[in-house]
Every structure is written in C-alpha cells, then in structure tokens.
C-alpha cells in the first residue's frame, strides 16, 4: 500500500464517522515530518510496516475523536511548532491575532507576563519575537507549567515560570509589570451544551471553564492590577465573543479613569479586550 492509498482509505473512515478528513493529512505530515509538498511528492511510495503500524495507531485515536494535535503531540503557532498534550489547550488561530496585537503595544527591554501560560505558546512567542524582553509565565496547573518549560527549552527562550493563581505570584514576589497578556479560562459552565465533543472530552476543563459566568479569572486579574502594573502598561485579554460589554462595564465601575477598547478578530468577532493601565 502506498501513502496515497492509505490516506484515501483513512479519509473514508473519518468521513463515515463524521470527523474532519483533513486531520488524516496532518497526521501523515507530522508523523513523517513532511511539508504538504513533500507529502504529494512521496504519495506513491510504499509504506513500511513500521510506518503503517504508526499511522494506523494514530488513525485509531482520530476515530475516537481525539484532536490530531494531541495524537502527534504538537501544534503550530505563529510559525513555530510547540509540544502539546491533554494537560494544555490546543492553540487557536485567533490567539495569534491577540499575540500580534500585544507585540505591537510593547517595546524591547520591557518586563511582561503571560498569565495562564498553559503550553507556553504566548510567552515563548513573545520572547522569540523580541529577545530583549523579560518574560514571566504563570499558571495554576503544575502539568501545564511542565509543558511550557519544555517548549521554552525547545525554542531556547528564557522564561521565568511561576506557579500560582492569577496575579498572586507577582504580588508575592513584588514583581512590577510593564505589560500583561492573558488568555484565561473564560467559558461559562452554562455553555457546555454548545461545546464540541472533541473539546469537552479531550481538552483540560481547568483551562476552559471559569465560574461567575466565565468572568472569575478576569475579575481576579483586574482587581489586582494596581498591585503589579506600571503606569502606562498595556493590558491585553483574549475574550469570548459575548464578553466585551460586561468587561467594559466592569472597568468603568472599578477603574472609571481607564479607557478600554474591544477589538474584533479576522472573523468579525470580538476577541481582544485591551487598555493601558494608569494609576489614579
């Protein structure tokens, strides 16, 4: 059997169970370490027994609904490849827009933090793009921090990792930040019914769901900003498409002197909640 025949057969199996066929191609490219062009050029090659066994095992996971990124244990983000596993979220394309916006708000030599660092994709991307930054990454999950540390090492990026909830570790260590970015858990428990089966079954709920209709972590972050933020520091949150109005009202209530902004993503959905911190 050659690669083209195997891919065609695997796609038919995926389609029959209602799964995305393109995951098969990603499986082949990642396991063979091929580009799409290389996959096309090699499609007539006969599979070795070892490769066939490897691909069949991967396909068996795909047919159970497991996202291909977890099957191959890696995901692409901002032009780089990162290690992922079920202890961390799979990077979303929309988050690249959030990171791109933040990168345009900061300057080299700043001290910045990624709160809720997860797999480390944001923190590592910041350091890789602007090497002179001092970057902190914090998370409440030990398992997630382990993945983030591996990704920082993989990309030769020095990140200062800390375990803790929201801004508590920064307050405890007296760290002052000149920039803050966070993609925290922001899905409410009430939204479980509209979530994809693959997300609910395989991605970590600790990184997905938050109490108080999804606003718990945002409130904790915003409440403690006065203790850690330097004057003029940019703050950037990734948000759900329905959360911009509430967060705008919350900031107007707690810190009425701060001007906030909600920015849409490429699909026209509210994605970024941002402002520059100013002391009263």
PLM features: residue spans?
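N-terminal auxiliary segments of SAM/dcSAM-dependent transferases
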Residues: 1-70
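N-terminal secretory/membrane-targeting helices
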Residues: 5, 11-14, 20, 32, ...
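Alpha-helical elements of Rossmann-like donor-binding domains used by nucleotide-donor carbohydrate transfer enzymes
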Residues: 9, 26, 54-57, 97, ...
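A general structural motif
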Residues: 21, 109, 132, 174-177, ...
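Short, basic/glycine-rich phosphate-binding loops at helix/coil junctions
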Residues: 35, 78-81, 198-205
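Short clusters of hydrophobic/aromatic residues that line enzyme substrate/ligand-binding pockets
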Residues: 39, 47, 71-72, 195, ...
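SAM-dependent Rossmann-like transferase core, predominantly class I methyltransferases
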Residues: 56-131, 135-147, 271-274
């Amino acid at each position: 059997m050659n690669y083209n025949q195997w891919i065609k057969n695997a796609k038919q199996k995926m389609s029959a169970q209602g799964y995305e066929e393109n995951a098969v191609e990603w499986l082949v490219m990642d396991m063979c370490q091929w580009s799409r062009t290389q996959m096309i050029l090699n499609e007539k090659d006969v599979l070795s027994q070892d490769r066939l066994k490897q691909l069949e095992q991967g396909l068996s996971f795909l047919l159970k609904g497991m996202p291909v990124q977890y099957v191959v244990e890696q995901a692409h983000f901002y032009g780089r490849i990162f290690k992922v596993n079920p202890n961390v979220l799979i990077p979303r394309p929309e988050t690249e827009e959030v990171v791109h916006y933040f990168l345009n708000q900061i300057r080299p030599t700043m001290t910045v933090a990624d709160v809720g660092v997860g797999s480390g994709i944001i923190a590592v991307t910041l350091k890789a793009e602007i090497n002179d930054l001092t970057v902190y990454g914090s998370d409440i999950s030990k398992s997630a921090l382990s993945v983030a540390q591996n990704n920082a090492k993989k990309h030769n990026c020095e990140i200062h990792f800390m375990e803790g909830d929201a801004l508590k570790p920064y307050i405890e260590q007296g760290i002052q930040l000149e920039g803050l970015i966070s993609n925290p858990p922001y899905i409410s428990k009430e939204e479980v019914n509209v979530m994809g089966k693959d997300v609910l079954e395989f991605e970590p709920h600790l990184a997905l769901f938050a109490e108080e209709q999804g606003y718990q972590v945002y409130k904790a972050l915003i409440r403690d900003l006065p203790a850690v933020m330097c004057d003029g520091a940019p703050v950037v949150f990734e948000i759900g498409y329905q959360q911009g109005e509430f967060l705008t009202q919350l900031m107007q209530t707690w810190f009425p002197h701060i001007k906030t902004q909600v920015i849409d993503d490429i699909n026209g959905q509210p994605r970024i909640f941002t402002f520059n911190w100013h002391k009263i």
